Design a protein with these regions (language model features):
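Noncatalytic linker/hinge segments flanking ATPase motor cores
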Residues: 17, 81-89, 146-148, 194-199, ...
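N-terminal Rossmann-like or analogous alpha/beta NTP/dinucleotide-binding catalytic cores
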Residues: 1-122, 213-214, 218-231, 288
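Non-catalytic terminal extensions that flank enzyme cores
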Residues: 1-15, 33, 38, 65, ...
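Short secondary-structure transition/capping segments
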Residues: 82-97, 121-128, 148-158, 278-293
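Alpha-helix initiation and N-capping motif
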Residues: 55, 88, 111-114, 126, ...
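Short, mixed-charge aromatic SLiMs
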Residues: 46-56, 244-246, 295-303
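Active-site cores that bind ATP or allylic diphosphates and position pyrophosphate for catalysis
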Residues: 112-251, 258-262, 311-314
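Charged/polar, solvent-exposed surface patches and flexible loops
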Residues: 60, 93, 116, 131, ...
Length: 314
């Protein structure tokens, strides 16, 4: 077996849809095509939105499709726990490393303040934090804490972080201009995705991260966190988003071709084969198992632009 360790990191807030399945398929194929293994981590930081029964269903669905992980989830393994809701003490340890470096500060801004007209926006519509609370005095912090419980942000430098994505190619962002100081912890104490995912992938030995292109812009800040925390960073492969026939992004909330509905109409091999066809991995939507696709898998066959599902494919 090679040293490649891929991973699934789904958020179990509902049944998986075709976009989630596509990401799992490519992550599995990318790892297995080089003789590697796959770890399943359940990203249930917000345990209220992510009940355990959805995580159990997710595991069963992956097994039904032939995409069962080698480690993690309810199967366990040497680097657990594999549920983020059970890893708060681990996140606290690494959060405190950033605190000791003087990089963490309280933020009292409301949502309306963050979306004020004078706040800079990225091209994707996300607000770049203006640093309103970055230089508060100790006295100001005491006064504001009496009125409002703060969230916690990390100070980023005016530095450009660049990397070469395994699929999308070169990408760079200036942290101060394109990202801004980002959240590490919510006011209710829940740790933010950006910190948790970095700590988890490093401690679980993940060497290859396959995820949607919508997370490409998160990578520079995560690479910076890896560096600040002294953790090894994986290679990144960002895949195109799978879109509905009308060009709309697939959503669990909208029930877009959830696996629950697909299971009533198709065999596992039919679902895998049609997804592989949509991703350019085969020339026709013929039924296939993941194992049958692994030997011929190549990222060069996967498009870089968003994939619109052909009408009538599902």
């Amino acid at each position: 077996m090679s040293s490649t360790v891929g991973r699934y990191a789904p958020s179990p807030s509902g049944r998986m849809h075709l976009g989630n399945l596509c990401c799992c398929l490519l992550a599995w194929l990318s790892a297995k095509s080089s003789g590697g293994k796959v770890v399943l981590r359940i990203e249930d930081l917000d345990a209220v939105r992510c009940p355990r029964e959805f995580a159990d269903l997710l595991e069963a669905d992956l097994a039904w499709l032939g995409l069962a992980a080698d480690e993690g989830g309810s199967k366990g393994g040497p680097r657990g726990p594999y549920y983020q809701s059970e890893r708060s003490a681990i996140y606290e340890e690494y959060y405190q490393k950033l605190v000791r470096k003087g990089l963490v500060y309280p933020c009292f801004c409301s949502r309306s303040q963050l979306h004020a007209a004078d706040a800079p926006h990225r091209s994707d519509g996300k607000v770049v934090y203006a640093g309103t609370c970055r230089n508060l005095t100790p006295e100001e912090i005491v006064l504001r804490t009496a009125r409002r419980k703060p969230a916690w942000r990390v100070m980023v430098p005016d530095e450009t972080i660049s990397f070469v994505d395994g699929h999308m190619g070169p990408y760079a962002e200036n942290l101060a201009q394109d990202c801004g100081d980002f959240y590490l912890r919510r006011a209710d104490g829940v740790f933010a995705y950006q910190l948790a995912v970095v700590v988890d992938d490093a401690l679980m030995g993940v060497t290859q991260v396959v995820r949607g292109a919508d997370l490409l812009s998160s990578t520079p800040r995560q690479l910076w966190l890896y560096r600040e925390l002294g953790l090894p960073a994986p290679e990144f492969y960002h895949m195109p988003l799978l879109l509905a026939v009308d060009g709309r992004r697939l959503s669990k909330r909208d029930g877009d071709e959830s696996l629950e509905h697909l299971q009533a109409r198709y065999t596992p091999e039919q679902i895998i084969g049609r997804l592989a066809y949509a991703c350019g991995l085969q020339n026709a939507p013929d039924p296939r198992t993941p194992a049958e696709l692994a030997d011929s898998f190549s990222w060069q066959r996967v498009p870089q632009n968003d994939i619109i599902l052909p009408e009538g494919l599902f």
